[in-house]
Amino acid sequence: ERYDLSMARIQEILTEETVPENYRDYFRKVTEFIIQCGEVLKAKEDGSLEQMTLEEGRTLNHKLYVDVLPENYETSYTNPAYAVKTLGEEYGKLLSYLYAEIRGDIIYAFEGRVLDLVIGNEALIEIYNLFEGETLPAAKEIKDVLYWSASDYCDVTLTYRVQEGVDPKLDFAKKIIMESDLSDLSYLYRFGAYISPEEEKTAAFLNSLPEEEIRKMADTYTDGYIRGFEVMGRDLSKKKTVSVRYPIGFERMVRQAVKNFESAGLSVIFCRSAVGSINRNPAGHSGYASSSPNRQYDYDHRYDSAVYMDKAFRDRKIGVLKTAYEQYKEDAAAYAGPAVIETFGEPGFEPVNKPEAWAFTEKQQNLYLEYRNLSMTVVNEYIPGDETSFTIIAFPVPAIGEQFTKIFKETIRINTLDYELYRDMQQKIIDVLDTAEYVEVIGK
């Protein structure tokens, strides 16, 4: 009901002229985007999202991400520099943050997370109402709306994040991976993530490999994970779940890995890379993800939690984290750790440091670090680190260049070398190095 009410109000905003002219374009752009995501939710609910052709998927994906693509970013309100230039310093930073948060609606619509859509809608409407007043709002009034939206709904957003990491019943991605016809690349567009030609090329390349090669890749990955428990003397039999973190495009290998893990008695969890600022890590993402539509956009918004990070918020977040893990403690106790697929060969990135982007003050930086330390203690209580393990395997992406196919096949060969033989060889090198005082590294 709240969703329907908020969407009805958002439809009205699209045609109203009740806020000062300078701010109308911002509110129209954001409401147009919200309405697009509302259409996605309808398509999910009536089943038509599942039936998209490859071309329809590409068109929808482009429409949803077009605003943050590099060619449009310079005149996008998600760009804090542009927002400040057009809306003023105080409003611009806050309203750019709000739009970036609302862009999470793409994922919420694809996953059918209606309450998350409501949270963004209601924050936008409340701020729009402030601009409808006889005088312009103070920046603090806008910031207060954003602060309390983040704080009040922390028990929704953070709790879901905890559940996402340990509960195999949340199977949005797993259903796509295990039930789709992977030879039809339209499945890539059902994740809701940005899909570039890289993901399509990777998926098409994996589709071209013989079943034996795919099995080899998956076996090396899953065997390495299971062997990690043996090497560290940890009891895998006590565990029931493993989290697979991987780059979208590798579904054919991942499907086989799921079968392998299930044969070993482990259900697979697919936790998406965090969407909202409350769950994002400024240092990078963890979870399944695609390539970014714009790495400068990610960089500009990496410290967006500076909008609300204070001691009261930190304390609230830790309290919610404890409650969430208590709620999912059985799932947490059954969790064995992550199995990670990484990639290499992506082009380099030179970020631009923008003064208009949010950044932590020294005090906020300390609060954030304190939260990280406190949260690690909470997580370790429910998922003891001495009971889990992990594995990491890496493959090239097409962006590595013309030799992609050759490098990929060579990577498979190296990854599938005789473990026993090379383990013994490496141990001999380690034994010799243990007798040394220092190592001199030479070369180019």
PLM regions and their residue ranges:
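Active-site bordering "gate/hinge" segments
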Residues: 1-444
